[in-house]
């Protein structure tokens, strides 16, 4: 791999991934709404784009060939937003937008993260009541 795109680049998982990629000489376009803090090192291998993730992102990414698109951006991972269907549906739209951006940019591979809460849906038919904590059940 030579060139990749990472959304959520300043988050816990995204910044950890970027550090590993850079250590292996991979050029990274890191996308996040902010790069406040010291999660990412200054590096010639990292291009930072401060932006939300929507269809307009494609125009902000430098032209070139990309081997992978890692979609790790996600809102509402804890607190009240975790149970807010509006926030979670916006996350789903963001993932769909990233798939379309990947296609538009001819990215070779698209990778995204899921949530442990998805596993709860497998037991839903057997539940007597739902937890009410998340939109999954």
What do the PLM-derived regions correspond to, one by one?
Residues 7, 31, 69-75, 110-116:
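SDR active-site strand-loop-helix element
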Residues 3, 27, 108-109:
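Residues at the starts of beta-strands that form the adenosine-phosphate
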Residues 4-24:
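N-terminal Rossmann NAD(P)H-binding glycine-rich loop of SDR-like oxidoreductase domains
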Residues 42-56:
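Rossmann-fold cofactor-recognition segment
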Residues 96-134:
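Conserved Rossmann-fold NAD(P)-dependent oxidoreductase catalytic core, especially the SDR/UDP-sugar
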Residues 52-90, 101:
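NAD(P)H-binding glycine-rich loop region in Rossmannoid oxidoreductase-like domains
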Residues 40-41, 79-86, 121-125:
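Conserved catalytic-core motifs of eukaryotic protein kinase domains, centered on the activation segment
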Residues 26-37:
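Conserved glycine-rich Rossmann-like NAD(P)H-binding loop of the short-chain dehydrogenase/reductase
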């Amino acid at each position: 791999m030579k060139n990749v795109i990472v959304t959520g680049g300043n988050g816990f998982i995204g910044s950890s991934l970027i550090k590993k990629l850079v250590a292996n000489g991979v050029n990274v376009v890191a996308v996040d709404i902010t790069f406040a803090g010291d999660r990412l090192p200054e590096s010639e291998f990292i291009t930072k784009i401060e932006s939300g993730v929507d269809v307009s992102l494609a125009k902000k990414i430098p032209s070139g060939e990309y081997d992978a698109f890692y979609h790790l951006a996600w809102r509402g991972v804890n607190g009240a937003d975790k149970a807010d269907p509006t926030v979670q549906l916006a996350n789903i739209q963001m993932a769909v937008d990233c798939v379309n951006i990947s296609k538009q940019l001819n990215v070779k591979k698209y990778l995204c993260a899921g949530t442990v809460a998805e596993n709860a849906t497998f037991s839903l038919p057997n539940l007597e009541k739902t937890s009410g904590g998340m939109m999954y059940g």
